[in-house]
């Protein structure tokens, strides 16, 4: 496979492609769509596929990858596949079985990257969001350092090439980094990051500790009713961004993605639209001038499209801290 996607070296010696394809599909009818769009993404040169147990479409994504291996488009080693440990499996004894369950669904022998999806622990079981009779989430109390040790064992067993975290704040990263007997540092922290939430302080902390920041929601967001405030401004309609797009003769989405790559961030782009999937690959055809990067830095307004409010009552809720 001849992909023009550049890679960044991780702190464990493996490398991650700087542009990834996001596969989150909220509704049932989008599951099949996520399979088709993943095939298209691989066809046009995406080799980094980001998924999760939470998305409930790993079977479809696995089929897409397998079909592209079988038709000779790619080899397994060309693909960088990320999965994530959901909050109902934080207890150490549940970590490996959860990863093995994902691998079975995917029909893969290993994942390239396995992340703790969210630092808030939920009651174990088959329900993704277990609730009591009043509709409140049923939380669990787990020491994330114990969860991390179980993640390290998954790496040692060859089930995951690299391990990292997602949605962790600085304090939570510090807790892992300062853990007595730490065997492997997290290779990355995948967080919401875009022009309206540029995460500059968290990025600086991650760089200082040789942790790659991976951006989800890099293009703002589709409007998922259950998790975002519908009054939030549409990122890709931002006048400064649109003017910049005109200047570079690119789309606002390409400018938003290039902004992240120029900061040393790995960006995830999600689309079910073939034309846009193809277009996102053009991000490697240009660079932004440093003055324009400064202008884009100025768009930050600390705006979260995914505030995850339903987890606020848990002591590990990550977004109360400044970063």
From Swiss-Prot:
<dbReference type="InterPro" id="IPR018170">
    <property type="entry name" value="Aldo/ket_reductase_CS"/>
</dbReference>
<protein>
    <recommendedName>
        <fullName>Aldo-keto reductase family 1 member C18</fullName>
        <ecNumber>1.1.-.-</ecNumber>
        <ecNumber>1.1.1.149</ecNumber>
    </recommendedName>
</protein>
<comment type="similarity">
    <text>Belongs to the aldo/keto reductase family.</text>
</comment>
<comment type="function">
    <text>Catalyzes the conversion of progesterone into 20-alpha-dihydroprogesterone (20 alpha-OHP).</text>
</comment>
<feature type="site" description="Important for substrate specificity">
    <location>
        <position position="54"/>
    </location>
</feature>
<dbReference type="InterPro" id="IPR023210">
    <property type="entry name" value="NADP_OxRdtase_dom"/>
</dbReference>
<dbReference type="InterPro" id="IPR044482">
    <property type="entry name" value="AKR1C"/>
</dbReference>
<dbReference type="InterPro" id="IPR020471">
    <property type="entry name" value="AKR"/>
</dbReference>
<dbReference type="GO" id="GO:0050810">
    <property type="term" value="P:regulation of steroid biosynthetic process"/>
</dbReference>
<feature type="binding site">
    <location>
        <position position="190"/>
    </location>
    <ligand>
        <name>NADP(+)</name>
    </ligand>
</feature>
<dbReference type="Pfam" id="PF00248">
    <property type="entry name" value="Aldo_ket_red"/>
</dbReference>
<feature type="binding site">
    <location>
        <begin position="20"/>
        <end position="24"/>
    </location>
    <ligand>
        <name>NADP(+)</name>
    </ligand>
</feature>
<dbReference type="GO" id="GO:0006709">
    <property type="term" value="P:progesterone catabolic process"/>
</dbReference>
<dbReference type="GO" id="GO:0071560">
    <property type="term" value="P:cellular response to transforming growth factor beta stimulus"/>
</dbReference>
<dbReference type="GO" id="GO:0042448">
    <property type="term" value="P:progesterone metabolic process"/>
</dbReference>
<feature type="binding site">
    <location>
        <begin position="166"/>
        <end position="167"/>
    </location>
    <ligand>
        <name>NADP(+)</name>
    </ligand>
</feature>
<feature type="binding site">
    <location>
        <position position="50"/>
    </location>
    <ligand>
        <name>NADP(+)</name>
    </ligand>
</feature>
<keyword id="KW-0963">Cytoplasm</keyword>
<dbReference type="GO" id="GO:0097211">
    <property type="term" value="P:cellular response to gonadotropin-releasing hormone"/>
</dbReference>
<feature type="binding site">
    <location>
        <position position="117"/>
    </location>
    <ligand>
        <name>substrate</name>
    </ligand>
</feature>
<dbReference type="GO" id="GO:0007567">
    <property type="term" value="P:parturition"/>
</dbReference>
<feature type="active site" description="Proton donor">
    <location>
        <position position="55"/>
    </location>
</feature>
<comment type="subunit">
    <text>Monomer.</text>
</comment>
<dbReference type="GO" id="GO:0071394">
    <property type="term" value="P:cellular response to testosterone stimulus"/>
</dbReference>
<feature type="binding site">
    <location>
        <begin position="216"/>
        <end position="221"/>
    </location>
    <ligand>
        <name>NADP(+)</name>
    </ligand>
</feature>
<dbReference type="GO" id="GO:0047006">
    <property type="term" value="F:17-alpha,20-alpha-dihydroxypregn-4-en-3-one dehydrogenase [NAD(P)+] activity"/>
</dbReference>
<keyword id="KW-0560">Oxidoreductase</keyword>
<feature type="site" description="Lowers pKa of active site Tyr">
    <location>
        <position position="84"/>
    </location>
</feature>
<dbReference type="GO" id="GO:1990646">
    <property type="term" value="P:cellular response to prolactin"/>
</dbReference>
<feature type="binding site">
    <location>
        <begin position="270"/>
        <end position="280"/>
    </location>
    <ligand>
        <name>NADP(+)</name>
    </ligand>
</feature>
<dbReference type="GO" id="GO:0007565">
    <property type="term" value="P:female pregnancy"/>
</dbReference>
<dbReference type="GO" id="GO:0071372">
    <property type="term" value="P:cellular response to follicle-stimulating hormone stimulus"/>
</dbReference>
<dbReference type="InterPro" id="IPR036812">
    <property type="entry name" value="NADP_OxRdtase_dom_sf"/>
</dbReference>
<dbReference type="GO" id="GO:1904322">
    <property type="term" value="P:cellular response to forskolin"/>
</dbReference>
<dbReference type="GO" id="GO:0005829">
    <property type="term" value="C:cytosol"/>
</dbReference>
<keyword id="KW-0521">NADP</keyword>
<dbReference type="GO" id="GO:0004032">
    <property type="term" value="F:aldose reductase (NADPH) activity"/>
</dbReference>
